[in-house]
A protein has these predicted regions:
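Active-site bordering "gate/hinge" segments
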Residues: 1-309, 324-325, 350, 406, ...
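Dual-mode signal for accessory low-complexity, basic/Gly-rich regions
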Residues: 269-467
């Protein structure tokens, strides 16, 4: 390897060199530097820990032709300087072999350079668990003394993304992402409870408090009550609300709605923007600068599809109200789909907040319940009907019966059939908004803040035998 090729090893240098090598009409280069640290435990003891590092480079070439602009995308992991030219040429060949891209737009320009673009990537390490790990060990001791077993994992990831384009963009974003999932089980495995947390640095995660919460829930489960399927007043905790609202956001395509394919389509044509979806003054929004839930302030698109476009790379992501005071305000669009539909440009953000409810905690909402069900979380959520956004899924790790303001026991699990849009319309109370980890979607979406919701007639369509 020559000194010239050996030099370009820092992510920003890799990006610059790839852009220099490009012979296409347009080029976008995305370098993702990822580091992770993790802990796993079972039966009140740590079992494994690890640290990983990785680099992925994505080159997007655009080629102008008589019939339009084509794009080619090639991504590779662990790319070295010597492999750059072959990667760039592969993207160019893919573009020349493709037809005109439907989503073609001029590459984004005019966005201010990130001042830290030339700095080395941020990294995580096992040091992120310096305070958390000893506290977890103390939780193991308490659980052991209390006759319960703790299982779970903690993962921390830090991704530094460098984005450069032939139109002059030089952008960078560092994204920390931490998740904790903790299960408590009785020694005979007949009772199980779960808690999860999303965090940027594990400094705000308290294993002792989580263990105490799970101990209470295992105590509730000592009394077992069988209930049939049916509609029940139900308290959905923030994690369950997050899973439902995230799926709703993923289904909020402006183009699909305009073309009559979704729950947000207006009968006879157009969209339901401006329609009241909830009598509660709820606001569903995304904001890349939301404290504690910060996310990329510009579009990072490694491929085109759905409501993202490689041509939009670097486009600023603005604070957006999807629902404002109960009214549908925006649907997700690219620049291309916005031009097709006449809707505003509204790229989807990587966080989601539902607020506008009361200041009552979930515990206070339980105390105000005559008879109803308290859920722990939802699992295995799948779409049944896009026209109504009817979803099906399972409850898991604890469904509790509340009578006269107190939990009186654990009931069986259920399969549910519900639409998140319908739930917003029927919810009678929203509690205090708090950061939460969506259990079903935690591999893809972790930055959420939600209230608990009270739904008077949640549809438990059948009984499930799972724990």
């Amino acid at each position: 390897m020559s000194a010239g090729t050996n030099k370009a090893q820092q992510p920003h240098e890799i990006v610059e060199r790839a852009l220099e090598l490009s012979r296409a009409d347009g080029c976008v280069v995305i370098a993702d530097e990822q580091s992770t640290a993790n802990l796993r435990w079972a039966g009140n003891a740590l079992t494994t820990n690890g640290v990983t590092r990785g680099r992925t480079l994505t080159v997007i070439a655009t080629v102008d032709g008589r019939e339009g602009t084509a794009s080619g995308v090639v991504s590779r992991a662990a790319v070295t300087a010597d492999e750059l030219e072959s990667l760039v040429r592969a993207a160019e060949a893919a573009a020349r072999g493709a037809g005109p891209a439907e989503d073609a737009q001029p590459l984004v320009s005019g966005v201010a350079r990130s001042p830290e673009f030339t700095e080395p990537p941020a990294e995580t390490s096992s040091a992120v668990f310096a305070d958390f790990a000893p506290a977890l060990g103390e939780a193991f001791a308490r659980a052991r003394a209390g006759g319960r077993e703790l299982y779970g994992f903690a993962n921390h990831e830090l991704v530094s993304t460098y984005l450069g384009t032939s139109t002059g963009l030089r952008l960078r974003h560092d994204q920390p992402n931490g998740t904790l999932e903790l299960n408590a089980k009785s020694p005979d495995r007949t009772r199980s409870a779960w808690a999860g947390r999303s965090t940027r640095d594990f400094k705000d995660v308290d294993p002792a408090a989580l263990d105490a919460e799970l101990a209470v829930r295992l105590g509730w489960a000592e009394r077992r009550i069988e209930l049939p399927a049916g509609r029940y007043e139900t308290l959905l905790p923030p994690t369950a609300v997050a899973d439902l609202m995230i799926y709703q956001l993923w289904s909020a395509s402006g183009r699909d709605a305009t073309e009559g394919r979704t729950v947000f389509s207006q009968p006879g044509g157009g969209t339901r923007i401006g329609e009241k979806l909830s009598d509660l003054p709820l606001t569903l929004r995304s904001d890349p600068n939301e404290p504690g839930l910060e996310s990329p302030p510009f579009v990072i698109a490694h491929s085109s599809g759905g409501d993202q476009s490689v041509f939009d790379n670097g486009l600023p992501v603005r604070p957006t109200e999807w629902i404002g005071a109960g009214e549908l305000k925006h649907l997700t669009t690219t620049r291309h789909s916005a031009a097709l539909t006449g809707l505003p440009v509204a790229p989807g953000a990587d966080n989601l907040i539902l607020d506008g409810g009361e200041d009552r905690s979930l515990e206070e909402m339980v105390a105000a319940t005559g008879r109803g069900l308290l859920l722990t979380c939802l699992w295995y959520i799948r779409e049944v009907d896009p026209a109504t956004l009817l979803l099906t899924g399972l409850t898991r790790d604890g469904v509790y019966l509340v009578e006269n303001g107190e939990v009186v026991g654990e009931v069986n699990n259920f399969r549910f059939n519900e639409s998140p849009v319908g739930l917003l319309g029927r919810a009678t109370e929203a509690g205090r908004t708090e950061k939460t980890l969506p259990r079903e979607w935690s591999d893809w979406f972790t930055r959420a803040a939600m209230p608990a919701l009270r739904v008077p007639d949640f549809n438990m369509s059948s009984v499930s035998q799972g724990v």
